[in-house]
Amino acid sequence: QHPTVQKMIDSFIEQYKGQADFDITLEAQPDSTTRDVLLGDVQNGADVFSFPDDQLSAMVAGGALAPVPNVQEVKDKMVAESVAAATVGDTLYAYPMTADNGYFLYYNKDYFTEDDVKTLDSILAVCEENGKKLSMELNSGWYMYSFFGNTGLSMNINEDGITNSCDWNTVDGDIKGLDVAEAIVNVISSPGFVSQPDGEWVAKAADGEVIAAVSGVWQAVAVKNIWGDDYGACKLPTYTCNGRQIQMASFTGYKMVGVNYYSKNKDWAFKLAQWLTNEQNQTLRFVEQNQGPSNKVAAASEEVAKVPAIAAVIEQSQYGVLQRIG
């Protein structure tokens, strides 16, 4: 993403030239470690930084984020779910940047029809018949949630913002945790299923072993290169649990741009954060990085709708929830 972001910075400097002398340094930082790096030395941290929504609570608790000043403008321009993801209590703490950080089903259309991918049972049956695999990183809690999320069972962060509550071991209700566990055992017992790290299945797709996988948009370019015109993507299927079909859930995810509470140039930092997330640059990010926009206008474009992975993550989002775990 480095060259893309640098283009945005260059256009920002051009837009505001003559109004200030800019010295903007772009440093690469994995999203997964932004929180830890910033909170480790927040007073000397970056003025402007991007991060995924599941780090927001910790950032706010650590006093790292300056509240967004132009809240109504952001609400008017961004999809509501992305604004909610950047909000704690009644305070908006960051500018939404992307709306695609969830997961869905990739599949090879050479093997599956649109009806085949509606249920996990039929997906596994096709895999078994062809000696192929459905891949999913089942030892990851992020993906494991998909089996529990739409069962009436819950897992949430408590009001303290640190501890969690979870009732997956309940003995009450139509669907119990044991029912879900038994359903998962049935899935992994299929010779058509393989659990492996998300980063490994693409290589297995390239050698023909994997023909379907639960993953996210970050693999879209690689999958398109491997499967070509047979590249398909859609919402997650239903699965069999306690004699019924249950729609698999997901964690939805959003990325955003925040401003350091301790920035010595806060006004300009807010201008840059807003610039990096405006319609123009969300469109640029989509074109060059295939990342789904949170800006309403950019997200509604025909070009976005034509990308199977983006369309799939949007379709799946109605069955997902924000990841809010301590």
Residue map of PLM features:
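Conserved N-terminal structural module of periplasmic/extracytoplasmic solute-binding proteins
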Residues: 1-55
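Short helix-initiation/N-cap motifs at beta->coil->alpha
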Residues: 27-37, 120, 193-206
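A structural signal for short loop-to-beta-strand junctions that line the ligand-binding cleft
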Residues: 39-40, 44-47, 75-107, 132-136, ...
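Hinge/lid segment of periplasmic solute-binding proteins
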Residues: 53-103, 115, 121, 232-236, ...
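Extracytoplasmic/periplasmic solute-binding protein
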Residues: 91-97, 103, 122-169, 210
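Glycine-centered hinge/linker elements that transmit conformational signals in sensory
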Residues: 163-197
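Extracytoplasmic/periplasmic substrate-recognition and gating elements
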Residues: 225-289
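C-terminal capping/gating helix-and-loop segments adjacent to ligand/active sites or protein-protein/ligand interfaces
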Residues: 251, 288-292, 309-326
